[in-house]
Amino acid sequence: MENFNMPRSTTFYALGLSYKKADAVIRGKFSLDAQAQSDLLLQAKAEGIESLVVTSTCNRTEIYGFAHHPYELIKLLCENSNGSIEEFQQAAYIYKNEEAVSHMFRVGTGLDSQILGDFEIISQIKTAFNNSKQEGLVNTFLDRLVNTVIQASKKVKTETKISSGATSVSFASVQYIIRNVADIGSKNILLFGTGKIGRNTCENLVKHTKNSHITLINRTKNKAELLAGKLNVIVKDYADLKQELHQADVLVVATGAQNPTIDKASLALQKPLLILDLSIPRNVDANVEEIPGVTLIHLDALSQITDDTLERRKQHIPAAEAIIDDMKLELNTWVNGRKCAPTIHALKSKLNDIVSAEFAFQKKKITHFDDAQMDLISSRIIQKLTNHFASHLKNENTSVDQSIEFIEKIFQIGQLAPNKTSSPIADKYKINLS
């Protein structure tokens, strides 16, 4: 039987920082770009971490993985980001075992998103999962857990209305612009950066402002051109950024840089400028606010905008939580099955030994003993008996550990079953980690 090969003291953890306790500056320090995530995985592998997934978005940076102590994972995060242990302690959270599993379900189904019902995080989890899998850092439990969370996310999205209505960071950005800039249709709008949020914001700008003066600039021009071709907006070279800044009425910054790309020195303004910084880490230096007429709005302020759509979404939280409970029960059933399998296998072997011994005894006493018929009958009886035991062990109301101990004592099969390893995850999820 496949096993996890887990050390005795290994625990499953979910730890990180999110918008709930960490502001944009702190989240920026712990933000991990693609290279940093790759480096973290390689370091984890070198340090003997068997299974781990790392995600980093504008709203959260998290690690899900197995370790002897959470510090092993915290160390990985701090050594591959610009954050310190002290900063982590002040703003982070650490969950273990059952709580860690529950946290991943809430994150993956949009219940823990900064904007309720925003499912963008599940695509990040999928990408992170695939990256870890390529490095051989996904064990059987984490594989099953992530796939169950993905299924739960799909069910919540399709079977509830928790994501109904237009509510996202990009939508909130455009609504803020419309509410705060008069005659928006005639203003010059500059979008700097065409990542996921940048693309979505551009689409919303075109759709809701009816503005024909939207300009895109990206360090890699062909990415901007691909987006511009779909939306019929203007593309300019990165070299033209300073000139375009001079002409802009509204600037939306959505680059993926690790340091500010816009600062006071970049701007030589002769009219008011509204700047929306949708980046983590922040890509607009706070010193731009020293310039008269400049208004700087950051991602977190936009995410706090609530409206009727969000209130309607909240009504569907109970339905989403019911789906999560069902999927967690399904996961737990699978885990129970993995734990009881060695005992069931040993029980079947013990019953076969009893039958074989009885056959050998009876063949000496019974003339014309029919081996084939007795093999068929005994096999069917043994299968039915083991099925009954397996069904009992997999029942959600069964105390699996006590039942396994009872079966092993009655049939004296403790030595036949593989040695079981105790660990917190085994205790919580009744899973065999031998």
Curated annotation (Swiss-Prot):
Q: Write down the PANTHER family for this protein, in alphabetical order.
A: GLUTAMYL-TRNA REDUCTASE
Q: Which residues bind NADP(+)?
A: G193, T194, G195, K196, I197, G198
The further comment given in this record reads:
During catalysis, the active site Cys acts as a nucleophile attacking the alpha-carbonyl group of tRNA-bound glutamate with the formation of a thioester intermediate between enzyme and glutamate, and the concomitant release of tRNA(Glu). The thioester intermediate is finally reduced by direct hydride transfer from NADPH, to form the product GSA.
Q: In which pathway does it act?
A: Porphyrin-containing compound metabolism; protoporphyrin-IX biosynthesis; 5-aminolevulinate from L-glutamyl-tRNA(Glu): step 1/2
Q: What is this protein called?
A: Glutamyl-tRNA reductase 2
Provide one Gene Ontology biological process annotation: protoporphyrinogen IX biosynthetic process from glutamate
Give the species.
Answer: Flavobacterium johnsoniae (strain ATCC 17061 / DSM 2064 / JCM 8514 / BCRC 14874 / CCUG 350202 / NBRC 14942 / NCIMB 11054 / UW101)
Task: List the molecular function annotations (GO) for this entry.
Answer: glutamyl-tRNA reductase activity; NADP binding
Q: What does this protein do?
A: Catalyzes the NADPH-dependent reduction of glutamyl-tRNA(Glu) to glutamate 1-semialdehyde (GSA).
Under the heading InterPro entries, the entry gives:
4pyrrol_synth_GluRdtase (IPR000343), 4pyrrol_synth_GluRdtase_dimer (IPR015896), 4pyrrol_synth_GluRdtase_N (IPR015895), GluRdtase_CS (IPR018214), GluRdtase_dimer_dom_sf (IPR036453), GluRdtase_N_sf (IPR036343), NAD(P)-bd_dom_sf (IPR036291), Shikm_DH/Glu-tRNA_Rdtase (IPR006151)
* Keyword Methyltransferase among UniProt keywords: no
Q: What is known of its domains?
A: Possesses an unusual extended V-shaped dimeric structure with each monomer consisting of three distinct domains arranged along a curved 'spinal' alpha-helix. The N-terminal catalytic domain specifically recognizes the glutamate moiety of the substrate. The second domain is the NADPH-binding domain, and the third C-terminal domain is responsible for dimerization.
| Annotated site residues (Important for activity) in this chain | H103
Annotated substrate binding lies at T57, C58, N59, R60, S113, D118, F119, E120, Q124
Subunit text: Homodimer.
Pfam families hit by this protein? GlutR_dimer, GlutR_N, Shikimate_DH
Q: Which family is this protein grouped under? A: Belongs to the glutamyl-tRNA reductase family.
- CDD domains registered for this protein in UniProt: NAD_bind_Glutamyl_tRNA_reduct (cd05213)
Gene3D superfamilies registered for this protein in UniProt: Glutamyl-tRNA reductase, N-terminal domain (3.30.460.30), NAD(P)-binding Rossmann-like Domain (3.40.50.720)
Keywords, alphabetical = NADP, Oxidoreductase, Porphyrin biosynthesis
Record bears the keyword Oxidoreductase = yes
